[in-house]
Amino acid sequence: MEWLVKKSCCNKQDNRHVLMLCDAGGAIKMIAEVKSDFAVKVGDLLSPLQNALYCINREKLHTVKVLSASSYSPDEWERQCKVAGKTQ
């Protein structure tokens, strides 16, 4: 399943991003913590590869590794963005 990045918080020191993801219909569904050497921006499309890897905007050389994922809630989003001083 492909995911659209709705919001992103990042910690540039360790290349970790917390992403708010929505489905093709635009409904917010997930919060995912990912690691990537590439910037992940609002509006990017994440397409599945294998082993918890997703490519950014169908560019197979630009990947993110999913570290964790949970169902979306406003409280959980805020908590994860604040953990480790991540900024939006």
Curated annotation (Swiss-Prot):
Per UniProt, what does mutating N11D do? In strain: ECOR 46, ECOR 48, ECOR 49 and O2:HN / ECOR 50 / P97 / UPEC
Q: Which GO terms describe its biological process?
A: response to antibiotic
UniProt cross-references to Gene3D superfamilies, sorted A to Z = 2.40.50.650
Q: Which domain of life is it from?
A: Bacteria
Mutation: V83A; reported impact is: In strain: ECOR 27, ECOR 33, ECOR 38, ECOR 39, ECOR 41, ECOR 44, ECOR 45, ECOR 47, ECOR 51, ECOR 52, ECOR 53, ECOR 54, ECOR 55, ECOR 56, ECOR 57, ECOR 59, ECOR 60, ECOR 61, ECOR 63, ECOR 64, ECOR 65, ECOR 66 and ECOR 69
NCBIfam families (UniProt xref):
PRK15450.1 (NF011994)
This chain's protein is named Signal transduction protein PmrD
Give the lineage.
Bacteria, Pseudomonadati, Pseudomonadota, Gammaproteobacteria, Enterobacterales
